[in-house]
Amino acid sequence: MEEFENKLIIDGNIFYYIDLKKIISIYPKLKKLPNTLKLLLENSIRNTDKSFHSQIIDSFINKNHEFDIKLIPDRLLLEDLDGIPILCDFASMRDFLKNNNLNETKLTPKIFIDLIVDHSLEVESVSTKYSCNNNLKNEISSNYERYKFLKWASKTFENLNIVPPGFGVGNQINLEYLTTIVCIKEINDKKYIVPEFIAGTDSHITMANAMGVNTINISSIDALALMLGEGISIQIPKVLGVRISGELDDFVNDYDLVMNLTNFLKEKKSSCKFIEFYGEGIKKLSLESRATISNMANEFNADIAYFSVDKQTINYAQKTRDVDVHFIKEYYELQDLINDENENLEYDEILDFDLNLVKSCIVGPKDPYSKVLLDKVASKLESFKRGNILRDNDIVLASINSCLSTANPFLMIQAALLAKNAIENGLDINPNIKASFTPGSKTVEKYLRQLNLLKYFEKLGFNISGYGCGVCYGNSGSLYPTIESEIENYKLNVSSVSSGNRNFSNTLHPLIKSNWLMSPALVIAYSLKGTVNFNIKADVISKDIYLKDIWPTNEQVLEYVQLINFKHFSTSYYSLFTGDSHWLEINEVNDTTYSWNDKSTTIQPFWEIYENQYYDKINFNNGRIVSVLKDNILCENIISFSIPKKDSLTFQYFNELGFHIDNFKNIERMKSNKFLLKKRLFDNENIQNILCSKVGAYSKEIESNNDINFTDCVEIYKKSNVPIILFAGKNFGSLKNSDAVAKVFKLIGVNVLIFESIDEDFRKNLVKMGILPLKLENDSISSLSLTGVEFVNIFAEDLSVNKLIEIEIIQSGIVNKVKVRILFKTINEIIYYKNGGFLSYLLKNVV
């Protein structure tokens, strides 16, 4: 590392850094590397042995997208839905160490962690001045056990900060306060300046890309690895350069921009996973405007949506954090990473996007990609049934929410001024609508109150109902009772309007099929009418008032933006890690290990997934097939966190505990409950085990030839030390929950998965859990004609990457030899597998 080292003296203090200019002077072809890749190069060089440096640099020069680079983030950002299960896993590792007569207190996170409790706010109380406090009080009461565990973790583990509920959304808090852009790290007794690199479990962590910070969305398994001091590996990504030109028209705002851009990028179907924005047009975009764009990277299939550091970045850091930013500016200038236009950099692909062509729109009704221009909405509607007090397309839920829009002062003030104009014209929202306002931080409430604008939200019923994800994540609470009855009785297709980034059918509320995304100002405007079935640009809203009569000009909005006292951005966070009185009342437990409750529905240890064995070869004899699945099985169907049906095994489990599932809208909060996850496995009407006649969580009991509960069948084999094998067709295990599925497969004792093809993230998670992934080389599920009575023998020595072997499938004494490929893609994966999985390896070799 010293060969590329340089030093910077600030106020008499010596700081070292990896000098990208020095590297580029030796390897000039790197000069045109996109800035986001230069940041990856710096991290990889800094965290890799010198003997690998030339190989790393050559791979960047030659754009070797198959080459794995090792990265070590500086900080881990967790939300509570994934963060609590991760901490439960970490706590259970302490149990594992203690049970093996090792010092459990040595196990503490090796990376700085900020865990923000933001996904558990249930928006039940709305439209009163007490709503915020009532919802917070109810949240802490209903999540008491989860939060008690968090308080224990914060007292027990070093490097862990907990942001209690009631402060906002993690991504917005990160943008406004936590992100530092550069970090100081101790390396070999030297102080190093490094560009901040953040890993996190929320898919919208990319919001920090707007500040020139690289981020990576990771699985819970990778998060645990980081906590144990291990890095993460990614292949050098392709980078799409998006050249921005022009500027937005007066009626168009940043929300319109990001939805137009999302639609544009989805249609282009680029293969690049990193996006870097540049061009003259970005000079017209505020930092908050860029953050609105970066937030949606996941929706346009990108891992990063990056803006290089420039004057906007430096100014935003200075005004929101009240810190001396010369340190940041000097570092990025030294590294040649401040670049307003990036015209001379080489991208794998380039697309042009003209801001002048952006049109005001809404998005929906069932995905965040389908842009609809305002004058075309009515023509996109499909059903027009009537009830007694409602019709199809009537709005029953309106929410100003999400870090996507509430982190943008322009959008917030625009909505406030529209509300003001509506009130002054005698307008009000439709009384059938449940309205709520859940900002992503307390900063929003402070500057709206300072500008005397909050009262206009409140007068229309958009009182602040809490600070968190709320409706955006589906925690919308109940609709008004008469409204719910009306929808169910007449089977109506009603609508929600919100300023978030999620709108798949039934995700915001189980009774709402059509969910429309739009800017906060349009949320209010549509709520004044009470339906989406009209042309909001041309038709009367009410009382001869049109949208143009109440829509504020950009100049009017910007006048207010200039008046914001940005000290609110630092003062709002003074008690960020302390919490309010509700949080402080939660009992604290002081012990080196956690006292688990076997009957808990939310907090359970997973120590059973760790092994203290070593396997030098693969040797499975007389394995039994417990499931044969068709093509395109999704992980979110294998383990679903939707409300279970009353005839499901999950519902029966809760009944046995005396737990009323009807009162618990989001069982995803129970991700740490190993018993629930086992019951939830395959408990879905979209899953059909080919071996069985019944749909869902069933397997074939061979002796009786009856369908029995899947986990019961697996348990029988596990107790007898019989290898447990699953077969699947093409495209097995895509979409979310793949880490949870891999963990539960390990927990119940699955040894081998054999498939035609598999999702890559799922494959990686299986290997990390010590489960053998085998790809059928020439055969298919249909050609094998499996019945479940077969025995399977699998043997392999001298394991290597993508090794081809033959397995034996035996039925009635007849041996069918089938070629399969062991899908280990790196030497490290083989090492992890031999140790019983990634986490077991780390426990044995790192801890």
What are these regions (language model features)?
Residues 1-72, 86, 583-584, 591-596, ...:
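Acidic/polar, glycine-rich intrinsically disordered N-terminal extensions of enzymes
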Residues 49-243, 258, 358-371, 375-462, ...:
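Long, structured ligand/cofactor-binding scaffold of large enzymes
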Residues 72, 90-145, 276-379, 537-591, ...:
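Terminal amphipathic helices with adjacent charged low-complexity linkers/tails
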Residues 190-325, 329, 413-434, 463-570:
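Mobile "lid/hinge" segments at catalytic clefts and subdomain interfaces of large enzymes
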Residues 274, 278-285, 501, 713-758:
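Extracellular/luminal Protease-associated
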Residues 428-477, 734-736, 740-743, 750-774, ...:
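Extended C-terminal subregions enriched in glycine
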Residues 543-552, 762-832:
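Acidic, glycine-rich flexible loop/linker segments
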